[in-house]
């Protein structure tokens, strides 16, 4: 089997930003390539993240496209890191943007969520409560909700497979949001391209494994993201990808096909994961 195409996170961020900026201006790829003096195939490779665009070329393209100063600064801060295998992403607008871009590059997304419902499976009420009760409030609330909405729509479209591994304690801590959130999980689990599995909290060895999302194409893992309160860490180092891929497999083996606690879930069968 061929190795997966690994695109470093900063490369993905810069390339997608160049492509989005060009499309917003309504300029065709060939026209822009002619204006900046490069071959269309070269510009296409930069926009797809197949090749790393030199920082000088990135600056020239952004200037020609007349992007706003905040966007210019954000992209130019990433440009020197374009070849790095890993990235700590601190830029607010990019938090959802890079995550979404990797999802689009994937044929399967595997998420391990030991302590909370995964973003893509949250009801709006659950998401709003999480944002409103955060230890440190910030101004990302509306942007965060919009990003989730876009990604949830993509999940419903069925363009890729999703596997969600949820710690059972998460389901016990829903309080007054319980019924609506459980119904939402049930509905999602009925989709042919979505698998939801519950991992028992009695699995002591799993308690030290923090949340992560693994992105895969048909050849294997292409990136993993570790999400934090003020930033995201994206990893594409092949050794680390292999380890997280192995961890995801181990979690799947230990997950339950049947509900862990019927009394807590208030239903005879929450999720049956047979796919």
Placement of each model-derived feature along the sequence:
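Interdomain hinge/linker segments and adjacent boundary elements that couple functional modules
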Residues: 2-25, 29-34, 41, 45-173, ...
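C-terminal regulatory/effector modules of DNA-binding transcriptional regulators
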Residues: 176-275
């Amino acid at each position: 089997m061929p190795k997966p195409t690994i695109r470093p996170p900063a490369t993905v961020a810069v390339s997608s930003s160049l492509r989005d900026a060009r499309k917003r201006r309504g300029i065709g790829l060939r026209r822009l390539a002619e204006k900046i003096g490069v071959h269309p195939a070269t510009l296409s490779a930069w926009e797809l993240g197949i090749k790393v665009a030199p920082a000088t070329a990135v600056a020239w393209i952004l200037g020609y496209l007349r992007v706003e100063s905040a966007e210019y600064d954000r992209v130019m801060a990433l440009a020197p890191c374009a070849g790095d295998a890993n990235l700590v992403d601190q830029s607010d607008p990019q938090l959802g943007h890079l995550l979404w871009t990797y999802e689009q590059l994937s044929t399967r997304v595997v998420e391990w969520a030991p302590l909370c419902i995964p973003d893509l499976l949250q009801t709006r009420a659950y998401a709003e409560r999480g944002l409103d009760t955060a230890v440190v409030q910030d101004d990302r609330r509306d942007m965060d909700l919009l990003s989730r909405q876009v990604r949830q729509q993509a999940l419903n479209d069925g363009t890729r497979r999703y596997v969600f591994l949820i710690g059972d304690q998460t389901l016990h801590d829903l309080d007054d949001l319980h019924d609506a959130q459980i119904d939402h999980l049930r509905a999602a689990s009925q989709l042919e391209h979505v698998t939801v599995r519950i991992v028992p909290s009695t699995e002591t060895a799993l308690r030290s494994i923090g949340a992560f999302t693994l992105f895969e194409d048909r050849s294997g893992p292409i990136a993993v993201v570790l999400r934090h309160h003020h930033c995201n860490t994206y990893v594409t180092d092949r050794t680390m990808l292999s380890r997280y891929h192995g961890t995801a497999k181990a979690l799947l083996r230990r997950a339950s096909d049947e509900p862990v606690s019927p009394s807590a879930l208030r239903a005879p069968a929450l999720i049956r994961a047979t796919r």
